Amino acid sequence: VLTKERKTKNNTSAIEPVFILDQTFCPNIRFMGKGETLSAVKAISYVSGSKFPSGGLCTAGYCVANEKAAELMKDIETHLKLCNNEATTLQVQLLAKQLPSMNQRISEAYINTRRFVNYIKKVLPEAKINFVSEELAKEGYTPSVFSLDLPTKGGSDKEKENYKRELNLQLINLMIQEIPNESKFCVSYGQLKGCYWTIPATSTQGTTKEEDKDYIVRASLSPNMDMERHEDIFMAFVNSI
């Protein structure tokens, strides 16, 4: 579909489109190298540096183009300079320090997340979990964030929703209270240590209409955290409901 030639209404060749890919959640995947998925079309990939690239130490990100779109990088550079939106020297230094370990951190964070997801499935099978399938993970898509829809009860939809929201906060508050040096109420992802929790399960809370928000828990795990402690506290939560 992406490589299909586009025509204008006069049946002349249209301007070739540019495919823009947000790789914030999978910066370790090579989509645009020779022979890869997006090598045959003009494509630009960008990553939020505040996530895995820097481990949360800075907000500067980066973008790259494949060979077909390489000419566009000069325009992107001009735009960043005009808007005074280039990375600072300190941000570049932080990215240079953290990027060499990024792929390893992604792999280890995924291992922790898969372990926690499997544990939740074991001790609270009624919960609904949205996490990458093991089939996709084998292809290299190894995120370390999942959403958790806790089981609820009540005589009406409103009662069920209110009860679930109470459980959400009960779980998160318990995690923060019992593991204050690791668990945080935070919407970010790709951190160097600890576990981040947030509700609703979206990083675009400010741009989502209230009626479209899904009040379920989102958890983001890191490569450096006490997994046994988190499992113990989750078990305590299960025993309390």
Report the location of each language-model feature:
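Well-ordered, non-membrane alpha-helical segments in soluble/globular domains
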Residues: 1-5, 70-73, 111-115, 158-179, ...
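PLP-dependent enzyme catalytic core of the Aspartate aminotransferase-like
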Residues: 1-15, 193-241
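Conserved PLP-enzyme active-site core in the AAT-like
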Residues: 1-121, 240
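Structural preference for beta-strand elements that scaffold enzyme active sites
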Residues: 18, 43-44, 145, 216-218
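A cross-family glycoside hydrolase active-site/sugar-binding cleft signature
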Residues: 20-24, 149, 220
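A short acidic, often aromatic-flanked loop/helix-cap motif at beta-alpha or helix-coil junctions
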Residues: 52-53, 136-138, 226-227
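Short beta-strand-to-loop capping motifs
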Residues: 65, 148-152, 221-223
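Conserved small-domain helix->loop->beta segment predominantly found in fold-type I
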Residues: 94-106, 114-216
